[in-house]
Amino acid sequence: MLQLTYDKEEMLIVIDKVVRKTMAMDLTWDWPCGVAYYGVSRAYTKTGNKEYLNMLVQWADEYIELGLPHWTVNTCAMGHMLITLYEETGDQKYWDIVMSKVDYIRNHALRFGDNVLQHTVSVANDFPEQAWADTLFMAAFFLLRVGTKLKDEEMIQDALNQYYWHIKYLQDPSSGFWYHGYNNVKQDHMSGFFWGRANAWGAYTMSQVKIHLKDWYLYPQCMDVECSLRDQLAALKGVQTENGLWRTVLDDEESYEEVSASCGIAAAMINNGNPLHTKYVQKALEGILNHISEDGRVLGVSGGTAVMKDRDGYRNIPKDWIQGWGQGLALAFLSDMLN
């Protein structure tokens, strides 16, 4: 556990502002909402504020009544919130939807190679045989949470297989950084940039494996997760900016600082628990708090980002609007600070 310095009361006030702004955004059942409400769920778990849980229940019940969309890898991100709702309320309808998403991932989602999940954002075959770092949060981490809860070894193995292959496909062994995506058809990383948020998806989800899988050391793939995260975080500390943040293209000093990536990376450092990272998390806290407005908006968050064609494609993604993933990753980080 890292020994971090912060004002707990101030932290609770900031979390409350971000939660309330997030719940007022009218997000729909897709991955931005999935990440956002994962963050709200974490805030509830860490603070015990029942009002946050009630907000989620009210939103979910209304949306379920209105009708749910088709499942994709991205829409499975909503499963994180549903796990919390089921655990806290015992209402079977939430768990039924969780298991519907699991059934989609296990039996219907597009895969390639050694059973690797293809990243999907719609019911179409959008990105044939492409692995994106995003998939780890939206599907693999979700599958791991359900598998460990049910003690379902096949599900756990499937989740860990996703981690293993995403590490092999996306991590650059020389730098330790992660590429945004991998194209199995062309056997390349497409434009080949180290996108900040991709590294946050990788680092954050890897930092969760030991937390959820108590006997992790009995699974060989977890050694890959442990070493991948070690090398990645060691590299990431070297490109933290003077403001305590990370850039949207990690190794490009002309690309802007991006707050959602910074939140995910700093949260991964907290969860990984290496005391050598204390000063980097402390610095990140200041930088992140400086980008949260009085009304709970997390600022400096890049818009939705495909695997762009060139460096300017990443540099020019707007960061003028609040986003569900920015709100959610900020809440995940701030909630982990309460440890």
Residue ranges of model-derived segments:
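Oxyanion-binding "anion nests"
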Residues: A203-L250
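Inter-helical turn/loop segments and adjacent helix faces that build the functional surface
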Residues: T89, V146-Q157, V209-M223, N272-L276
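CBM-like carbohydrate-recognition segments
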Residues: L2-P32, S41-K46, E51, E62, ...
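Aromatic- and glycine-enriched pocket-lining scaffold segments that form the walls
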Residues: V116-Y182
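Acidic/Ser/Thr-rich, low-complexity mid-to-C-terminal regulatory regions of eukaryotic proteins
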Residues: F177-R197
